[in-house]
Amino acid sequence: MVCLICMAALCGTLRAETIKGNGKVITKEYQFADFDEINFVGPAEFTYVQSEAAPSVTVTIDENLLPYLEVKVKGSELHVGPKTEGMLGRSKDLRPTVFKIKGNSKALEEVNLAGSGSFKADQMVRTKELELNLSGSGTMRIAMLQADELEGNVAGSGNLILKGKVREAKYNVAGSGDVKAEDCESEEVEGNVAGSGNLEVYAVRELTGNIVGSGDIFYKGDPKVKSSCIGSGKVRKR
């Protein structure tokens, strides 16, 4: 969650001049050592595949913006975003006409998205632990997930959409964003809402729901329910 806050701060402070894409779109492929954490900023559309193939990242963007874009792996973390300059960490305000990223790695443990972009994984993602952090108005979508532990954090107006099966899930929503995980079956679920956002979950054995504000928690299944609500929000069975 700390990383999410830092990314949001970076995204919104001390920007230099705006640079618009010239419409001449190019694609560049990068070869990296394996990574299991993804961090990206801005309006990019990121498509991810978990694969045993050699890790790679492909970026499609306006040619005049590519020199201002940083694509790197440090440790096990992939970072894609505007380059920062100087001690104050200034960055260009990039306005691409197209900004697409495709990436594959052998494992996935964390995804951080700040801005209006999107992250999607249409194929199976298997992992022991997965943390998803979304700040802004973007969207994260995983179509087939298998995990022991899952944490999903939404700050702002974004949407987190999940399908699959996990053992333990924890969801936190701050603002007007939504978590749509009623097709992600979980043995135990903890859901926390602060604001007007909503959670949709599937809990088998136990559900703990905490609400401050007007948001609601909707659930499928027949779990033992513990709830605390301050405001007009409620924990409701589908």
Language-model features: where?
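Intrinsically disordered, low-complexity terminal regions
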Residues: 1-238
